From Swiss-Prot:
The protein's assembly and partners: Part of the 30S ribosomal subunit. Contacts proteins S9 and S11.
Gene Ontology molecular function: rRNA binding; structural constituent of ribosome; tRNA binding
Similarity annotation: Belongs to the universal ribosomal protein uS7 family.
Record's protein name: Small ribosomal subunit protein uS7
Role this protein plays: One of the primary rRNA binding proteins, it binds directly to 16S rRNA where it nucleates assembly of the head domain of the 30S subunit. Is located at the subunit interface close to the decoding center, probably blocks exit of the E-site tRNA.
């Protein structure tokens, strides 16, 4: 990491259908081997399935799923003397969003529906209703932070 200059954030364009930057970030995270059109069709296909099953606005379901998965605290390792402590720290908003996106996609990929569209739509609907593995991951992270609250004075 450079001490002199911090890396400047790159501008990303909002997605063509909804005009939402978060959806673009989500698409970029789903994309494999630079195949943006495939990622786009997966995300929009999943949104169509969500709209068909829930009769709600897919963007609203997506944002509520992200909010339900996003962690507020996490633990970080801190070495003090000879011991390593798991210190609970608050999560910055950018990292919170990135973790939520990453956990949603990982949970969707682990599901056992046949297509990625079905997996993603299922995970989005589950997360919007506070169910599913992505929400469980958030709960585990919060439990870990709660269990290590005694070490919160080692915060930096």
């Amino acid at each position: 990491m450079s001490r002199r200059h911090s890396a400047e954030k790159r501008e990303i364009n909002p997605d063509p259908k909804f005009g939402d930057l978060v959806v673009t970030k989500f698409m970029n995270a789903i994309m494999l081997h630079g195949k943006k059109s495939v990622a786009e069709s997966i995300v929009y296909g999943a949104f169509d399935v969500v709209q068909g099953k829930t009769k709600q606005e897919p963007l609203g379901v997506f944002h509520s799923a992200l909010d339900n998965v996003a962690p507020h605290v996490e633990v970080r390792s801190r070495r003090v003397g000879g011991a390593t402590y798991q210190v609970p720290v608050d999560v910055r908003p950018e990292r919170r969003q990135a973790l939520a996106i990453r956990w949603l996609i990982t949970a969707a990929r682990k599901r056992n529906e046949t297509t990625m569209v079905d997996r993603l739509s299922g995970e989005l609907m589950d997360a919007a209703n506070n169910r599913g593995s992505a929400v469980k991951k958030r709960e585990d992270t919060h439990k870990m932070a709660d269990a290590n609250r005694a070490f919160s004075h080692y915060r930096w």
